[in-house]
Structures are given as C-alpha cells and as structure tokens.
Amino acid sequence: MIEETHPNDDSYIVRVKAVVMTRDDSSGGWLAQEGGGLSRVGVCKVMPAELTGRSDFLIHGERLKDKQVILECFVRKDLIYTKATPTFHHWKVDNKKCGLTFQSPADARAFDRGVRKALEDLTEGSTTSSSTLQNEAELGDDDVFTTATDSSSNSSQKKDHSTQLVATSTFYEPHPHRCILQYRPPERYTLDQKFSRNLFPFEDEEIVRINPRERWMITGYEDYRYAAVPDKFIQPEDSDSYVQISKNDPVKHDYTYPYVPSPDFTQCDLKRPCGGGSTVVSTQPRAFILKGKRRKEDGERSRCVYCRDMFNHEENRRGQCHDAPDPIRTCIHRVSFMWCADSMLYHCMSDPEGDYSDPCSCDTSEERFCLRWTALLGLAMLAPCLCCYPPLHGCHRCGVACGCCGGKHKAVG
C-alpha cells in the first residue's frame, strides 16, 4: 500500500502516449480498456508508507480526454514482459495481464527500456540518486523522458523544512512520501542543496532492436508527436570554417606585420609603394584555408519520424530506414503467406518474451532447428505459396541494395 497514488511529474522514468489494452480470455484477444482512447502512460517511482529502505515502481496510465486513471500496475521481479510487435507490448504480473498499443516503435523502445531499468533497480536494490540520474540519462530516447523542474511549491517546502535528520539516506527530496534511500550512517543534510540533472535527449543512445524479422501485422506506423528538434542541438553545416566576421570596414589596430613577398598581397595592401623603403602591411593576413580537406556540404539534416535517427535529405533514398513502411515488403509477406509461418512460430515456438527465430534461419546450432523446419515443411504442404517467399525475398533485397525498394526516412514536423 502507498499513500500517494498520483505521482509527481518528476518521479517518472519514462512517459509515452499509448492506448491501454486488456486481455479478453473469452475470445483470446486484446481489447481497448474502458472504451479506449489515447492515454499518457509512464513508469514512476513511489515510496511505500513503511520506509523499508527501497522504493517501488508503478506503471501509471491516465486517459487524456477525461484525466481518468485507467492503469495502475506495480512492477514486480516476476514480471513477464512480451514485445509482440514493434508497436504492441504486453506484460503479466500477479495473474494480471496488461498491454499497450504505442504510436511509434520509438515510443515502444523507450517504454521497454524504462521497464527494464525498473526491474534492474528492483533486482539490484540500487535506488540512489546518482544511479537514478545516470540511468535516466542513458535511457534518453528523444523527448519521451521527463526532466525534473523546480516549482514554487518545492521552494516553499524547502523553507518549512530547513534541516532533516535522515538515518539511511543521502538526501531527501522535497516531495511528500518520496525519498531516495542509500544505506549510510546517520548524518544531517540540508534541503537547500540543488542537484543538477543533465539530460541530453538527442545524444546517441544504445539502440535495442525489438525483433530482427518482420511481423505480418506490419503495415507502417506513424509518429504523431512530431517533436521538433531544438536549434541548439543542430550541428553547423560547415565545421571546417574558422571564424567568420562580416564588417564593412577593416578593424583598425596598433599591430604591424612585416612584409613578406607573397602573391596573396597586392600593392593595394601596402601603405607605401614597393620601392619606398620599409613597407608595413595595414591589413591582417588572410585566414589560412586547408585546401583539399574541406568536406562536401552535408545539406539539410533532419530527424526521422520512424527510427529517430538524423538523416541527410540529399542522400535519402529507399532502403535507408528499416522502420519505415515498405509496401513491397508487406505485399510479399501477405502474398507468400509468410504471416502464417510467423503466427505459428509466435504461438508455438516463442520464448516467454515472445521472441522466436527467423523462419528462414539456417543456424544448425539452434535448439529447435529440426522442429522448426519440420513445422514449416508441413505448413508448406497446406499453403504452397510459402515456397514463393525465398525468391521474392531475394529480389526484394536486391531492390533495397539498388535503392528501388525499402522505406525512406521522413522528417518530423
């Protein structure tokens, strides 16, 4: 039991927009919970009423249209998390099954990493502030991770409680029923200290691929967030330039430069004619230019709405984005009845996380290699169209290599 079931915004590890799903055992399918609708779902940290020295993690979902809480599920060590498709994940804990339909694979990957972080903290018992901030910075998947913000209520609480005696903690955060604990001798700490949180949402993070193969349900996804990239994170187009100063008149200064005969200087740059004794150059020497090392202009760069990677518009062609919709690939999966093989392997030969081997994999070291190919041969007897998949898939790969097939990057905004 916890006293506070509505966590603050800065207690969230990750927050995304998704549709909350519930399992219908009668039909064996998933249905939208309580009429459906887009909800804001996140993994947050809460502190139980009994200060046991560690905090719990709660998956909290609130529907956007009416602000109704439709999902509250505690993260336990025995939680079984399944990534069924790139945009649909579900989990089971305490005989309770919940699911989320995300708007994009990027949101799904971010939520998956948030759940993994919560499970790691529960397993290892590492709930210190330093590890929390470090892990959140490493988890950063664009703009779905929340950052802590100071408010007037926080400042007023700091004034009321100027000094706290914390027996087993490094510091006490000024929020009711929430503190981050670490086993240390009792000391006195003031609440006037400020802790900075440095998050780099556009820093390259470790990409965790959900599945190396395609699901038969894949028909393309769209990211409805359209998060614009701040200008301060956009790299300059030409990083080889030194300093560019645009002024009408040359700057007057007291320095003089000895005249060195060079074709770069003309008689217009000299204060006196060449035969008039010592000459003094009144202008600064020209900037040194590295010839042959200036790279080609990169052109305009944007962030892809599907894979969230930066791409160049001039070099964007088909086959560059693996997460983008590919009508030809989807058509091949449907015409060749490959979706039947995926469905059979998912329901019969998948692990607890819902992953299974590639249907066309020839890795003999796999545990169920013979069983998988026997099942595929039996399925091919019922659906002969499966024999058309290898040549069609080979032609599609050639088309991707030539730039004729495959998905293209799409800029946000």
Swiss-Prot record:
| Membrane association type | Peripheral membrane protein
Q: Where, subcellularly, is it found?
A: Cell membrane; Cytoplasmic vesicle, Secretory vesicle membrane; Cytoplasm
What effect does gene inactivation have here? Morpholino knockdown is associated with increased Erk phosphorylation levels and results in a high incidence of embryos showing delayed gastrulation, or delay in elongation during the segmentation stage, with reduced formation of the head and tailbud. Morphants show yolk elongation at 12 hours post-fertilization, indicating enhanced MAPK signaling.
A single GO cellular-component term from the record reads:
plasma membrane
Q: Where is the KBD domain?
A: 195-248
For this protein, the record's Pfam families field holds: Sprouty, WH1
Recite the UniProt keywords alphabetically. Cell membrane, Cytoplasm, Cytoplasmic vesicle, Membrane
Concerning SUPFAM superfamilies, the annotation shows: PH domain-like (SSF50729)
GO molecular-function terms, A-Z: protein kinase binding
Q: Which residues form the SPR domain?
A: 303-411
Question: Where do the segments described as Disordered lie?
Answer: 122-163
Question: GO:BP terms for this protein?
Answer: negative regulation of ERK1 and ERK2 cascade
Q: Does the keyword Iron apply?
A: no
Question: Key word Membrane present in the record?
Answer: yes
Which PANTHER family does its entry note?
Answer: SPROUTY-RELATED, EVH1 DOMAIN-CONTAINING PROTEIN 2 (PTHR11202:SF11), SPROUTY-RELATED, EVH1 DOMAIN-CONTAINING PROTEIN FAMILY MEMBER (PTHR11202)
Q: What does this protein do?
A: Negatively regulates Ras signaling pathways and downstream activation of MAP kinases.
Name by which UniProt lists this protein: Sprouty-related, EVH1 domain-containing protein 2
Gene source species: Danio rerio
